[in-house]
Amino acid sequence: MAGVTSFVIPMGIQTILFPWLVAVQLQESADRLGIAQMSTQLPGLFLILFGGLLADRFDQRKILIGFHVIAAIPAAGLALLMYLDLLSYWALIGYALMMGTVGAFIQPARDGMLNRVAGDQLQRTVTVTMGLTFGAQIFGFAAASFADSIGAIPLLVLHSLIVFSGALISLKLKPAPPQPQDVNAGSRLNQIKSGLKVVIRSPRMGPALVMMMAMSTFYGGSFVVLNPIIVRDIYGGGASEISM
């Protein structure tokens, strides 16, 4: 459970701090903010299925350790750039792409590990995990709301340290070797295609997938762009207002 919060808290910080840096600090336009926000999600769109495949084929504990270490680098690098007064729009794009890529591999490994840890208490574990996730996100939002007063550098350092702590926490987990694979499953790409077909054709998972796509398309994307712009241009607000 501590491993879950070690990634969710930094993502909560990023959710507020990243658009604040783009829209408030750099005063970028709405279209450039949209591109920046898209960059945080774009790697996951193409890599999340490969992340799931990797989690099925390799030790999930090792994946979590390695990618948590890697995930600590972008925030630390961005903090260094800000300390050197070298912050730029393209530096933020690079940060977004790196974090999006890392997240595409951490999430499947974390979810797979959760299934192993839960055992026969899966429903209870999922409920507790959801509660921790919401709580950790709120903590991240609250921390990032102080960006106007303390600046971004301390928050980026905090972001990096918490993510790195996830690697240390994962060291305490038992090894999670991959489950036996079906020799008739075919190539990795065919396995991904088969998984997509199962989800799309499922009377339960298919509608849920459509609903999530609709929410992301018609609400999520516009919200993460319009909210910071409205806060900045209409209300003259900053990080604390964005976090609300």
Specify the residue positions occupied by each region the protein language model found.
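Alpha-helical transmembrane-bundle signature of multi-pass membrane transport and export proteins
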Residues: 1-244
